[in-house]
Amino acid sequence: MVLAEDLECLKALALMGGMREPVFISSQTLGEVLETSPQTASRRLKALEGQRLISRTLNPDGQHITVTKEGEDGLRREYAEYCRLFAHEGGHYTLPGIVISGLGEGRYYMSLEPYKKQFLRHLGFEPYPGTLNLRLSGSDIPTRKKIDSLTWIPIHGFSAEGRTFGEVRCMPCRINDIPCGIVVPGRSHYPEDIVEVIAPVGLRDALGVKENDRVNVEVAYD
């Protein structure tokens, strides 16, 4: 886990352009940016480097620093958490569903690297290989349609292994404070009473649910 003060330092380096290219900075200057001593700034850099969140090349009068992919992913997770936090100011829809078995295809699709990278970038987590499948009652279809009218995140398709994998839509959501995402294949005629949910953990185990148990999915809106 990244400490708050180290995350502050990482954010400052990213704002200087460290995610695009190496930035040259001394511990003295970084300390001034962070309103702390050069020694403390140096310790934070060592901590970030130790966690592989930055890479750096030392020079006599400073250092070239680059925010690594791991560092960028850490910032994206932080951003996603703030988005979920403040999105609740608008309100939320609650979508109750009954746990059902799927076809097992979710495990395969969630293991594909191009999908995993996009979910990490947009949702702030790498999905557990598999989906939680829920069936809605007829009375909850209107709520599902309201959620469908919100702005969804497109997950782009790609070609691999001699196959073409289509676009997927996803919607950030939560189940019992676990960050999740509703996923809908791009193909038309997807059943409106079925909801597939991804998460960073296996939801059946994390929630302690089994077939025919009831689960509430919460979707925030502005």
Swiss-Prot record:
Keywords: Flavoprotein, FMN, Kinase, Magnesium, Metal-binding, Nucleotide-binding, Transferase. CDP binds at G102, L103, G104, E105, G106, R107, V201, G202, L203, R204. Pfam families: CTP-dep_RFKase. InterPro entries: RibK_CTP-dep, Riboflavin_kinase_archaeal, Riboflavin_kinase_CTP-dep, Riboflavin_kinase_dom_sf, WH-like_DNA-bd_sf, WH_DNA-bd_sf. Residues 1-92 are annotated as: H-T-H motif-like. Residues 93-222 are annotated as: Riboflavin kinase. GO terms for biological process: FMN biosynthetic process; riboflavin biosynthetic process. One of its GO terms (molecular function) is magnesium ion binding. PANTHER family: RIBOFLAVIN KINASE. Catalyzes the CTP-dependent phosphorylation of riboflavin (vitamin B2) to form flavin mononucleotide (FMN). Belongs to the archaeal riboflavin kinase family. This is Riboflavin kinase. The lineage of its organism: Archaea, Methanobacteriati, Methanobacteriota, Stenosarchaea group, Methanomicrobia.
